[in-house]
């Protein structure tokens, strides 16, 4: 038993001194429990897990706490467990909800997992990687057409506060996880507890909870938990990929909070802050997480990550660092949300690696580029319209504007998960239908219909039917 003693507590960071030659390794889990203390007089029980982060010299280590450090005192005994934080993995974790340490938090008893894995692991080697070019159909028109997702790829949903990231990730869970019979892992990183609770209950009601493992480290938890909970969720997904050779879905909401937690402890660990006050190790930390979320020859991890954009600034170091790791980026725009168009995806800012004629086919590619071309032209004409009005445009430009406004509205779509709020039933639009609908608008087949007929419908037939009702 390797015991040390607490010599300093600074919020979530604790310094512990060990006997000479018995320093715990970096990333080892260290436990402080009231049961280990001699004549402990505190009013409540203490059971805190910390992670060794730095060796300070003088036989001391600086650790980051995974739960609140309330009640800690100098001189308390701390036990080096001799291993990193480890969480349960395998089929037994499905249908359950965990915290960062892998302890169940759904009040459904202990988890009888046969194996536990450490949360820190190496990324797969280069020769084991398996690039993918198969399109993952989401049933959301704007995504499938303009920034399609790859099976086994990494997707980022970027957006400021309140533009619909969480609703979009819930719709993707609804459309992909419900259609798809495999396993999913959901990691709630530093987001609202209420949303996690709602999601758990939705999974329960819809009957897909038996195929989902959930891990939460929410907003109210100390930065240590928020910094490591993404790794706890990831290791559960890695087990399904590497040992069971499954194709797994990994949902993370929100990657920005992972970076934010790192920056909260960075200064306490004595590092010099870098740009905008972030930790100097920002890109390393992001890389260590993202490089593990990948598809190998054994199985794949398809990941969807919501990424908060502080003050709507995509050049902020946190979202900017995440961009480099993704196969597809879906950018949510406040300007589009203000028009009442949901999902508020920016069709000109969102990108995908697989929007390529060799992957999606010539028809899909030409329709997608045609839609973007018209929307781009409309964007350029907006200044002229604002100053001189529509009448000053040429006949061709008037047609472009009319079609662009129809396309803009046709990119909106009612969601299943928002049905309770909007009263409109959600729509799943197959990719073929999306391509056909936009192709018809581009060809001018629906120039006679009012633009409001295209708002919040599924397929093009619904828009035509809506126009007839309005007439």
Curated annotation (Swiss-Prot):
Q: How does it assemble?
A: F-type ATPases have 2 components, CF(1) - the catalytic core - and CF(0) - the membrane proton channel. CF(1) has five subunits: alpha(3), beta(3), gamma(1), delta(1), epsilon(1). CF(0) has four main subunits: a(1), b(1), b'(1) and c(9-12).
Matches recorded under HAMAP family: ATP_synth_beta_bact
What is the purpose of this protein? Produces ATP from ADP in the presence of a proton gradient across the membrane. The catalytic sites are hosted primarily by the beta subunits.
Q: Does the keyword Translocase apply?
A: yes
Put simply, this protein is called ATP synthase subunit beta
Protein family membership: Belongs to the ATPase alpha/beta chains family.
InterPro entries in UniProt: AAA+_ATPase, ATP-synt_VA_C, ATP_synth_F1_bsu, ATPase_a/bsu_AS, ATPase_alpha/beta_chains, ATPase_F1/V1/A1_a/bsu_N, ATPase_F1/V1/A1_a/bsu_N_sf, ATPase_F1/V1/A1_a/bsu_nucl-bd
Question: Which cell locations does it reside in?
Answer: Cell membrane
Q: What is its main location?
A: membrane
Catalysis performed (reactions): ATP + H2O + 4 H(+)(in) = ADP + phosphate + 5 H(+)(out)
* GO CC, one annotated term: plasma membrane
Name the cystine pairs: none
Its EC number(s)? 7.1.2.2
Q: Which key words tag this protein in UniProt?
A: ATP synthesis, ATP-binding, Cell membrane, CF(1), Hydrogen ion transport, Ion transport, Membrane, Nucleotide-binding, Translocase, Transport
Regarding the membrane, this protein is recorded as: Peripheral membrane protein
